[in-house]
Protein backbone atom coordinates (compact mmCIF):
# COMPACT_ATOMS: atom_id res chain seq x y z
CA UNK A 1 0.00 0.00 0.00
CA UNK A 2 2.81 2.40 0.88
CA UNK A 3 4.87 1.75 -2.26
CA UNK A 4 2.36 3.39 -4.68
CA UNK A 5 2.07 6.38 -2.34
CA UNK A 6 5.86 6.80 -2.16
CA UNK A 7 6.13 6.39 -5.93
CA UNK A 8 3.49 9.08 -6.43
CA UNK A 9 5.32 11.44 -4.08
CA UNK A 10 8.62 10.95 -5.90
CA UNK A 11 7.02 11.41 -9.32
CA UNK A 12 5.29 14.66 -8.41
CA UNK A 13 8.13 16.12 -6.41
CA UNK A 14 10.67 16.24 -9.24
CA UNK A 15 8.73 17.95 -12.04
CA UNK A 16 10.50 20.87 -13.75
CA UNK A 17 11.23 22.85 -10.59
CA UNK A 18 11.41 26.57 -11.27
CA UNK A 19 13.22 27.06 -7.97
CA UNK A 20 16.03 24.67 -8.95
CA UNK A 21 19.51 26.03 -8.33
CA UNK A 22 20.41 25.81 -12.03
CA UNK A 23 17.44 28.07 -12.87
CA UNK A 24 18.12 30.54 -10.09
CA UNK A 25 19.42 33.16 -12.53
CA UNK A 26 16.25 33.06 -14.64
CA UNK A 27 12.59 33.89 -14.14
CA UNK A 28 10.83 30.72 -15.30
CA UNK A 29 7.80 31.59 -13.17
CA UNK A 30 6.76 33.82 -16.09
CA UNK A 31 6.20 30.62 -18.12
CA UNK A 32 4.39 28.63 -15.45
CA UNK A 33 1.65 26.40 -16.83
CA UNK A 34 1.03 24.09 -19.80
CA UNK A 35 1.94 25.34 -23.28
CA UNK A 36 1.00 23.65 -26.58
CA UNK A 37 2.53 23.66 -30.07
CA UNK A 38 0.28 22.24 -32.81
CA UNK A 39 1.03 21.32 -36.39
CA UNK A 40 -1.35 19.87 -38.99
CA UNK A 41 -0.20 17.98 -42.06
CA UNK A 42 -2.20 16.80 -45.06
CA UNK A 43 -1.53 13.06 -45.41
CA UNK A 44 -4.09 11.82 -48.00
CA UNK A 45 -6.48 10.18 -47.48
CA UNK A 46 -6.07 11.42 -43.89
CA UNK A 47 -5.03 14.50 -41.94
CA UNK A 48 -2.36 14.20 -39.26
CA UNK A 49 -2.22 16.55 -36.30
CA UNK A 50 0.70 16.59 -33.87
CA UNK A 51 0.56 18.52 -30.61
CA UNK A 52 3.47 18.92 -28.22
CA UNK A 53 2.75 20.00 -24.66
CA UNK A 54 5.31 21.57 -22.34
CA UNK A 55 4.75 21.81 -18.58
CA UNK A 56 6.74 24.61 -16.95
CA UNK A 57 7.06 24.69 -13.14
CA UNK A 58 4.49 21.88 -13.04
CA UNK A 59 3.60 18.71 -14.91
CA UNK A 60 1.53 18.85 -18.09
CA UNK A 61 -2.11 19.47 -17.18
CA UNK A 62 -4.36 16.45 -17.71
CA UNK A 63 -7.25 18.86 -18.36
CA UNK A 64 -5.46 20.51 -21.28
CA UNK A 65 -3.86 17.28 -22.52
CA UNK A 66 -6.16 14.36 -21.58
CA UNK A 67 -4.35 11.92 -23.89
CA UNK A 68 -1.03 12.45 -22.09
CA UNK A 69 0.10 10.26 -19.19
CA UNK A 70 0.27 11.82 -15.75
CA UNK A 71 3.40 13.46 -14.35
CA UNK A 72 5.15 14.40 -17.59
CA UNK A 73 7.13 17.55 -18.39
CA UNK A 74 6.84 17.08 -22.16
CA UNK A 75 4.22 15.15 -24.12
CA UNK A 76 3.65 14.65 -27.83
CA UNK A 77 0.29 13.49 -29.17
CA UNK A 78 -0.27 12.45 -32.78
CA UNK A 79 -3.84 12.21 -34.08
CA UNK A 80 -5.11 11.08 -37.47
CA UNK A 81 -8.44 12.11 -39.02
CA UNK A 82 -9.85 10.01 -41.85
CA UNK A 83 -13.51 11.03 -41.87
CA UNK A 84 -14.69 13.44 -39.19
CA UNK A 85 -13.07 12.48 -35.90
CA UNK A 86 -9.44 12.44 -34.86
CA UNK A 87 -8.01 9.17 -33.52
CA UNK A 88 -4.95 9.20 -31.25
CA UNK A 89 -2.24 7.07 -32.86
CA UNK A 90 0.86 8.02 -30.91
CA UNK A 91 1.71 9.44 -27.46
CA UNK A 92 5.24 10.27 -26.33
CA UNK A 93 5.82 11.32 -22.73
CA UNK A 94 8.92 12.57 -20.93
CA UNK A 95 8.26 11.70 -17.31
CA UNK A 96 8.82 14.35 -14.67
CA UNK A 97 11.14 12.10 -12.65
CA UNK A 98 13.71 11.90 -15.45
CA UNK A 99 17.03 13.45 -14.47
CA UNK A 100 17.45 16.81 -16.16
CA UNK A 101 20.68 18.38 -17.34
CA UNK A 102 20.94 22.17 -17.37
CA UNK A 103 23.44 23.76 -19.77
CA UNK A 104 23.83 27.54 -20.15
CA UNK A 105 23.58 28.82 -23.73
CA UNK A 106 26.09 31.59 -24.36
CA UNK A 107 26.92 32.90 -27.81
CA UNK A 108 27.17 36.21 -29.63
CA UNK A 109 23.58 36.01 -30.86
CA UNK A 110 21.78 33.97 -28.21
CA UNK A 111 21.76 33.54 -24.46
CA UNK A 112 19.67 31.31 -22.25
CA UNK A 113 19.69 27.75 -20.98
CA UNK A 114 19.24 24.26 -22.45
CA UNK A 115 17.34 21.57 -20.54
CA UNK A 116 18.06 17.99 -21.65
CA UNK A 117 16.02 14.85 -20.98
CA UNK A 118 17.63 11.47 -21.57
CA UNK A 119 16.25 7.94 -21.59
CA UNK A 120 12.47 8.41 -21.60
CA UNK A 121 10.65 5.11 -22.06
CA UNK A 122 8.54 4.92 -25.21
CA UNK A 123 7.44 1.36 -25.86
CA UNK A 124 10.59 -0.67 -26.41
CA UNK A 125 12.62 2.45 -27.23
CA UNK A 126 14.37 5.17 -25.26
CA UNK A 127 13.94 8.73 -26.51
CA UNK A 128 15.66 12.00 -25.64
CA UNK A 129 14.79 15.68 -25.76
CA UNK A 130 16.56 19.02 -25.72
CA UNK A 131 14.63 22.22 -25.08
CA UNK A 132 16.44 25.50 -25.66
CA UNK A 133 15.12 28.44 -23.66
CA UNK A 134 16.43 31.56 -25.41
CA UNK A 135 16.39 35.04 -23.91
CA UNK A 136 14.05 37.45 -25.73
CA UNK A 137 13.97 40.82 -23.99
CA UNK A 138 11.33 42.17 -26.36
CA UNK A 139 8.81 39.42 -25.54
CA UNK A 140 6.67 40.40 -22.57
CA UNK A 141 4.06 37.67 -22.18
CA UNK A 142 4.19 36.83 -25.90
CA UNK A 143 6.39 33.74 -25.67
CA UNK A 144 7.19 31.58 -28.69
CA UNK A 145 7.31 27.78 -28.46
CA UNK A 146 8.70 25.98 -31.51
CA UNK A 147 9.30 22.28 -32.20
CA UNK A 148 12.38 22.20 -34.41
CA UNK A 149 12.38 18.46 -35.11
CA UNK A 150 11.24 15.03 -33.94
CA UNK A 151 12.49 11.83 -35.58
CA UNK A 152 11.02 9.24 -33.18
CA UNK A 153 14.29 9.28 -31.23
CA UNK A 154 15.21 12.88 -30.47
CA UNK A 155 13.10 15.99 -29.86
CA UNK A 156 14.53 19.46 -30.41
CA UNK A 157 12.42 22.39 -29.25
CA UNK A 158 13.00 26.08 -28.68
CA UNK A 159 11.31 28.61 -26.43
CA UNK A 160 11.93 32.31 -26.89
CA UNK A 161 10.90 34.20 -23.80
CA UNK A 162 11.85 36.94 -21.39
CA UNK A 163 11.85 34.19 -18.75
CA UNK A 164 15.14 32.86 -20.16
CA UNK A 165 16.94 36.17 -19.58
CA UNK A 166 19.25 36.51 -16.59
CA UNK A 167 17.19 38.24 -13.92
CA UNK A 168 17.93 39.63 -10.48
CA UNK A 169 16.08 38.14 -7.51
CA UNK A 170 14.26 41.43 -6.87
CA UNK A 171 12.73 41.40 -10.36
CA UNK A 172 11.58 37.80 -10.26
CA UNK A 173 7.95 36.82 -10.36
CA UNK A 174 7.11 34.33 -7.65
CA UNK A 175 5.71 31.02 -8.94
CA UNK A 176 1.99 30.67 -8.39
CA UNK A 177 0.46 27.60 -6.86
CA UNK A 178 0.32 24.83 -9.52
CA UNK A 179 -3.09 24.09 -11.00
CA UNK A 180 -4.89 21.26 -9.31
CA UNK A 181 -5.40 18.67 -12.06
CA UNK A 182 -7.15 16.26 -9.75
CA UNK A 183 -3.81 14.51 -9.29
CA UNK A 184 -2.85 16.06 -5.96
CA UNK A 185 -4.12 14.75 -2.64
CA UNK A 186 -5.53 17.18 -0.08
CA UNK A 187 -5.42 16.88 3.69
CA UNK A 188 -8.91 15.32 3.76
CA UNK A 189 -7.71 12.42 1.58
CA UNK A 190 -4.77 11.74 3.90
CA UNK A 191 -7.04 11.81 6.96
CA UNK A 192 -9.39 9.35 5.22
CA UNK A 193 -6.48 7.01 4.36
CA UNK A 194 -5.18 6.99 7.93
CA UNK A 195 -8.69 6.44 9.31
CA UNK A 196 -9.15 3.42 7.03
CA UNK A 197 -5.75 2.05 8.07
CA UNK A 198 -6.52 2.58 11.77
CA UNK A 199 -9.95 0.94 11.54
CA UNK A 200 -8.53 -2.01 9.59
CA UNK A 201 -5.81 -2.56 12.19
CA UNK A 202 -8.34 -2.18 15.03
CA UNK A 203 -10.87 -4.63 13.60
CA UNK A 204 -8.44 -7.29 12.35
CA UNK A 205 -6.19 -6.95 15.41
CA UNK A 206 -9.16 -7.16 17.78
CA UNK A 207 -10.48 -10.26 16.04
CA UNK A 208 -7.07 -11.91 16.17
CA UNK A 209 -6.78 -11.10 19.88
CA UNK A 210 -10.21 -12.58 20.62
CA UNK A 211 -9.40 -15.70 18.62
CA UNK A 212 -6.05 -16.25 20.35
CA UNK A 213 -7.67 -15.84 23.79
CA UNK A 214 -10.09 -18.60 22.90
CA UNK A 215 -13.16 -16.37 23.21
CA UNK A 216 -14.31 -17.34 19.72
CA UNK A 217 -14.76 -20.63 17.89
CA UNK A 218 -12.95 -19.44 14.78
CA UNK A 219 -11.43 -16.26 13.37
CA UNK A 220 -14.58 -15.44 11.38
CA UNK A 221 -16.69 -15.50 14.55
CA UNK A 222 -14.14 -13.31 16.32
CA UNK A 223 -14.19 -10.86 13.43
CA UNK A 224 -18.00 -10.74 13.50
CA UNK A 225 -17.95 -10.07 17.25
CA UNK A 226 -15.46 -7.21 16.90
CA UNK A 227 -17.51 -5.69 14.07
CA UNK A 228 -20.70 -5.87 16.16
CA UNK A 229 -18.95 -4.18 19.09
CA UNK A 230 -17.63 -1.49 16.76
CA UNK A 231 -21.10 -0.86 15.28
CA UNK A 232 -22.56 -0.58 18.79
CA UNK A 233 -19.83 1.92 19.67
CA UNK A 234 -20.59 4.04 16.61
CA UNK A 235 -24.32 3.96 17.35
CA UNK A 236 -23.69 5.12 20.91
CA UNK A 237 -21.48 8.05 19.92
CA UNK A 238 -24.32 10.56 19.22
CA UNK A 239 -25.88 9.90 22.65
CA UNK A 240 -22.49 10.13 24.34
CA UNK A 241 -21.66 13.44 22.64
CA UNK A 242 -25.13 14.83 23.39
CA UNK A 243 -24.74 13.88 27.07
CA UNK A 244 -21.38 15.65 27.28
CA UNK A 245 -22.80 18.79 25.64
CA UNK A 246 -25.77 18.81 28.03
CA UNK A 247 -23.48 18.47 31.06
CA UNK A 248 -21.20 21.25 29.84
CA UNK A 249 -24.02 23.66 28.99
CA UNK A 250 -25.88 22.75 32.21
CA UNK A 251 -22.73 23.40 34.25
CA UNK A 252 -22.28 26.81 32.62
CA UNK A 253 -25.89 27.78 33.33
CA UNK A 254 -25.46 26.70 36.96
CA UNK A 255 -22.38 28.86 37.40
CA UNK A 256 -24.16 31.83 35.83
CA UNK A 257 -27.17 31.43 38.17
CA UNK A 258 -24.94 31.27 41.22
CA UNK A 259 -23.38 34.60 40.27
Swiss-Prot record:
Coiled-coil residues: none
Cysteine disulfide partners in this protein: 18-57, 68-75, 135-165
Record's GO cellular component terms: cytoplasmic vesicle membrane; Golgi membrane; mitochondrial membrane; phagophore assembly site membrane
Family recorded in the similarity comment: Belongs to the ATG27 family.
Keyword vocabulary terms for this entry: Autophagy, Cytoplasmic vesicle, Disulfide bond, Golgi apparatus, Membrane, Mitochondrion, Protein transport, Signal, Transmembrane, Transmembrane helix, Transport
Domain MRH, chain residue ranges per copy: 16-167
InterPro entries associated with the record: Autophagy-rel_prot_27, Man6P_isomerase_rcpt-bd_dom_sf, MRH_dom
Principal location class: membrane
Domain of life: Eukaryota
Listed transmembrane segments: 185-205
The name this protein goes by in its record: Autophagy-related protein 27
Function, in words: Effector of VPS34 phosphatidylinositol 3-phosphate kinase signaling. Regulates the cytoplasm to vacuole transport (Cvt) vesicle formation. Plays a role in ATG protein retrieval from the pre-autophagosomal structure (PAS) and is especially required for autophagy-dependent cycling of ATG9.
Originating organism: Meyerozyma guilliermondii (strain ATCC 6260 / CBS 566 / DSM 6381 / JCM 1539 / NBRC 10279 / NRRL Y-324)
Amino acid sequence: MWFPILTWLVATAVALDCSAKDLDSYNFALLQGTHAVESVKDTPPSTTKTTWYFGICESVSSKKAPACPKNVDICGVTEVKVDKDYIVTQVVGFNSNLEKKYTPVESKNENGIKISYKGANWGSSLVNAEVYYICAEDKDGDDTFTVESWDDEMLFAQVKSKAACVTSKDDKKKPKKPEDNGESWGWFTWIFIFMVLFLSIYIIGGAWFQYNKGNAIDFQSALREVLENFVDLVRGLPSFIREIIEKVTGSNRGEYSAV
